[in-house]
Amino acid sequence: MSYLVVTIKVILITGMPGSGKSEFAKLLKERGAKVIVMSEVVRKRYSIEAKPGERLMDFAKRLREIYGDGVVARLCVEELGTSNHDLVVFDGVRSLAEVEEFKRLLGDSVYIVAVHSPPKIRYKRMIERLRSDDSKEISELIRRDREELKLGIGEVIAMADYIITNDSNYEEFKRRCEEVTDRVLKNG
């Protein structure tokens, strides 16, 4: 069952925590894309259904166990509804099951873009940004990386249609993002 007759392009953003996924999504939004942040969709559900003391990542794992590995993708497509955007972006894809679910629901104009940044740079960013799910301890950040890899994020990164390396300054990262976006919009 497809939710949209796809004449749009869909970008699935993946990458390890702190790699720059959200920055890429923000740049795409500035270009007029509809952006859905997958973790926000999960957080919305978490606020209603989480068990006392349950971590967000554990809640997401439980959702997958109950509803299948593509559940977060389905929830995100439901959140999308009907869209009149030429470009739709899902920020935070973590498994091939999610990729397959997006393709099943949205058609073949789906492109995976991985944002890559070396671990030392990512850890420094995460310590500086201090999101609620970030830790100040390197050991905790390494543990989180391992959890993400167990979910299958490495497989999604390996299957990426495009990879943006985020190891320089913001202007260079922005240039690389624009280059990849232009390629997706032009050719796919």
UniProtKB/Swiss-Prot annotation:
HAMAP family xref list: UPF0200
Gene3D superfamilies: P-loop containing nucleotide triphosphate hydrolases (3.40.50.300)
Protein name, per record: UPF0200 protein YG5714_1176
Keyword vocabulary terms for this entry: ATP-binding, Nucleotide-binding
GO terms, molecular function: ATP binding
Family statement: Belongs to the UPF0200 family.
Lineage: Archaea, Thermoproteota, Thermoprotei, Sulfolobales, Sulfolobaceae
Keyword ATP-binding: yes
CDD domains assigned to the protein according to its UniProt record, in alphabetical order: DPCK (cd02022)
Entry keyword annotation includes Nucleotide-binding: yes
Binding-site positions, ATP: 15-22
